[in-house]
Amino acid sequence: MSINQKRALLVIDIQNEYFTGKLPITYPSGSLANVLDAMDAARAKGLPVVLIQHTSPQPEATAFRKGSKEWELHPEVAARMHDVLIHKSLPGSFTGTELETWLRQRGVETVAIAGYMTQMCCDTTARQAMHLGFGVEFLSDGTGTLSIKNDAGAVSGEELHRAILVTQQARFSRVIKTSNWINQL
């Protein structure tokens, strides 16, 4: 088994909610194009591509409601070849899903994280993967987020994204630009 056969690309929650819904991704620009490039490169090199789709567990939810247009995968992601589609209802892609079993059955040792949002499902999934013994590669420009304001304060998308990347690199992942990741396949 080659090193590439021991890797998989996880494409997390590239759904219309982040483009035409209530949560438009604003940082970094070009993240969708980088995800698509990563998907194409992974397929060309024979790496498994795993699509992950979030569904709100509340049937009356205003975001990620199953069956809604915003819940659907982005059409450019949906049109690309992938090996499996994993459905989840919590930020961690391993929680309550068959993801770990699917990866282990294929001898995957390292996962690359791409998708949305950096600080939620991507960060949580990367941490879970590390806890489960997988190596983790976090695509710095193939993940994205938006500015957030709530009762605890406000943070820009850029600040939030950078803080997660620094934290990921400190302990959980190898943070890498998509173009460098592709060149190393």
Identify the residue ranges that each predicted region occupies.
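Short, glycine-rich nucleotide/cofactor-binding loops
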Residues: 22-29, 114-119
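Short acidic, Gly/Ser-rich segments with clustered Asp/Glu that frequently serve as metal-coordination loops
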Residues: 17-20
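Short beta-strand segments at enzyme active-site cores
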Residues: 11, 47-54, 139
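Active-site-adjacent betaalpha module
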Residues: 1-8, 36-40, 45, 62-185
